[in-house]
Structure formats: C-alpha cells, structure tokens
Regions:
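Hydrophobic alpha-helical transmembrane segments
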Residues: 30-35, 50-51, 74-75, 112
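C-terminal membrane module of polytopic membrane proteins
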Residues: 78-145
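Hydrophobic residues within alpha-helical transmembrane segments
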Residues: 35-39, 55, 75, 79
C-alpha cells in the first residue's frame, strides 16, 4: 500500500488535475509539464532531493502527455516507490531502512531499475505519439457530405 496509494493519488492530482489545468492555461504541453514537475518536487519538501524529484515529475508528465493515459505514469510511479520498499523489507525485515543504511554498490545496482523502466515506457509512448500524429496527417480530408 505504501507504493500503490501515492502512485495513484499523486498522479491523479499532479497529472490528472494540475497538468491539465496548466495545459489549458499556458496552451503548451512542455510548459505545463515543467511547471507541474516543479510543483510536484516542491510538495515533497526535500531540499537535496528537489532536482531528482523534478526529473521524476518530468518523466511522469511526459508519460501522461505522450500516452494520453494516467496509467503509464501511475505504473512508473508505483515501480519507483515499490523498489525501495521491497529492498528495505528484504534487507531488514519489517523495518524501513534509509538509503544511507544500504551499501552504495547495492543502491547502484537496484535503484536504476525504476528509472530504466520509466525511460523504456517514455520512449515507447513518445514514438507511438509521433507515429499517431504522422498517421493522422496522412489521412485524406473528407468534406462530410
């Protein structure tokens, strides 16, 4: 539940509400994504984690923008949250372990997994979005008569 509830709740709020509002306000997908990512990171209230969380917010924002669905950012957010929770459980039983308690070499192996999964989804949906845009440009225009 630690990984599920924030993934669904935060994505509904940040991508499903804020990003849509900013898109209507700015009429720019990129600006809406960046503003939402900055707010997403600021709300987490971690000074040293601001840039990494902003980058996560950008990834989640582009996943939503290019896929047209909340599910890809929810899944990516879930994986990002679940990996450290599972890791902590495996390392220390039922207690939550801080990243500083986990050997650096182990962090370097496991923690990039959610990032790689997100990048793969991001590239897939970007390619699909470009393909869909190109195919709609190549369709003949009918007069509707």
């Amino acid at each position: 539940m630690i990984a599920v509830i924030p993934a669904i709740g935060e994505e509904l709020i940040f991508r499903g509400v804020f990003q849509k509002i900013f898109f209507r306000l700015f009429r720019s997908g990129n600006l809406a994504i960046w503003v939402t990512a900055i707010i997403f990171s600021a709300v987490h209230l971690q000074f040293y984690g601001f840039v990494p969380r902003m980058i996560l917010g950008l990834v989640f924002g582009y996943l939503f923008f290019w896929s047209g669905s909340l599910w890809p950012p929810v899944i990516s957010h879930f994986v990002n949250n679940a990996v450290p929770v599972i890791w902590s459980y495996l390392e220390g039983g039922h207690k939550i372990i801080e990243n500083s308690d986990i050997a650096l070499w182990k962090q370097m192996i496991v923690l990039p997994l959610p990032v790689l999964a997100s990048i793969v989804m991001l590239l897939y949906f970007r390619k699909k979005s470009i393909k869909d845009a190109n195919s709609s440009l190549n369709q003949p225009v009918t007069s509707g008569l």
